[in-house]
Structure formats: C-alpha cells, structure tokens
Design a protein with these regions (language model features):
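Multi-pass alpha-helical transmembrane bundles in non-GPCR membrane proteins
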Residues: 2-240
Length: 240
C-alpha cells in the first residue's frame, strides 16, 4: 500500500522555510530580534566563518578523534553562516548537528585518554554514542527546537568534566584558553537575556573567542596524546 508523505515544515527544493499553521520554530538570536525576526544577521553570519578558519590557521590535530573535532568545527562555521544569514531550518540543522558531533568526538577522545582499554571504557563510550544518536534524532523534531540549548548544555558539561579530569591526570594547562572561550560565552548569554543594540555584539564575540580559546585546548590535549605515543607502543585500535 503506497504512502503519501506530506512535507509541511520544509521545502527541500528551495532550501527555505515554508509556512505552517501549526508548527513553527523561533530565531532566538538578539540580532534578528532587533530586526523583527528577519534576516540576515550580518554580524552573526560573517563572524561565524572565524570558526571555520581557525583550524586552518593553527593546524589540525594528529590524534584522529581530535582531528574529527577540528573537521566538525570547520564545517560548523560554514553551517552557522548559512543559519544566521537565512534563518531557516536547513541551516539550523547543519549548525547544531556539527556542534553535537564535535562534542561527541571530543568526549570520545577524552574518555580514551582517561581510561585504559577496558569494559568500563567501552561502556562509557557506548553511553556517549547512544546519547549522541538520541540527541540527533530528537533534534530533527521541530517541536523540540527549544530544548537544544538545555540538552547541549548538559552534553558539553560532561565534556568539561572530562577536560578537567584528563588535564589533572596529565598536568595539562588549559584554564587560560578555556577562560577565553568562557568570556565569549558570557557575551553571548548576556546578548540573549538583555538584548539591545549594544549587547547584540555578544554573539559575534562568542564566534571570535570560542574558537581562539577552545581550539588551543584541543591542540594542547593533542600534544599530550602524541607525547604518550612516543613513550609506548600503542595498539593501533587505540587510535580508532
């Protein structure tokens, strides 16, 4: 029996949002709120490209899992540009999926650095993979649009805990660079909660300071991983 599929949310031929009387999603960025929720968000869009440029300036990590994080960040800048410029569902998915995957690969790498090959490590990685998959699927449902910041906040919180754990374990200095990203995050939060013509620049500040700080943290952890490789012969599976 054939199925008739009705696409109410999105016109994939034009890559633009189409009207739906029952389902909508909000553009909760200060710059577009000041423009009656209309694009393009010029400042937000063009500063997003900084995220894509940073990996090419500082270089890509050697450890495959951290290399994947860098690749996702390079993709994220372009996807974020599309989202902020066109304010459509396609751009939103591209932006948020690359964020989820970047955190997934980063957390996977941190888990492997912190735990030796064991059943416990495998179980933690399984949980990370399951969480990522459920998050991706639920995020495609337009009614769940408002949940992304909260769920991603929990997910990134787990990564921050692992950054602290691994840094303490191997005596890696990360506080200064993570602090730079924190300043950018603070600017973004202020812009969304106290939106005006001045605070709207908090989001572009995030696009600048987040990659400058966080990417250096990635490179420091990659340097540590490579130094470990020089002192012991690792199983090739370790780097998968």
């Amino acid at each position: 029996m054939p199925l008739a599929l009705k696409i109410d949310v999105y016109d994939y031929q034009r890559f633009m949002p189409i009207e739906n009387k029952n389902i909508t999603f909000n553009h909760n960025f200060c710059e577009s709120r000041l423009q009656d929720f209309k694009g393009p968000e010029t400042w937000n869009a063009y500063t997003s490209l900084i995220i894509s440029i940073v990996p090419f300036i500082y270089g890509f990590p050697t450890y495959p899992l951290l290399y994947n994080v860098a690749c996702m960040l390079a993709v994220n800048g372009i996807a974020s540009f599309h989202y902020h410029y066109f304010l459509n569902w396609f751009g939103k998915q591209g932006d948020e999926i690359s964020m989820i995957l970047a955190n997934y690969f980063g957390l996977w790498g941190l888990i492997n650095m912190s735990y030796k090959k064991s059943i416990k490590r495998n179980n933690i990685n399984r949980f990370n993979t399951a969480f990522m998959y459920i998050f991706l699927v639920s995020n495609t449902i337009i009614n769940n649009d408002y949940l992304f910041p909260s769920i991603f906040g929990v997910y990134i919180g787990g990564t921050l805990v692992m950054i602290y754990k691994v840094a303490k374990q191997y005596k890696i200095k990360y506080e200064r660079n993570l602090g730079i990203s924190f300043i950018g995050a603070t600017g973004w939060i202020i812009s969304e909660h106290y939106c005006n013509k001045y605070t709207k620049y908090g989001h572009p500040l995030w696009h600048l300071l987040f990659p400058l700080g966080f990417y250096k943290v990635i490179l420091e952890f990659d340097k540590m991983k490579q130094s470990l490789n020089l002192h012991k012969k690792e199983d090739p599976i370790e780097n998968v």
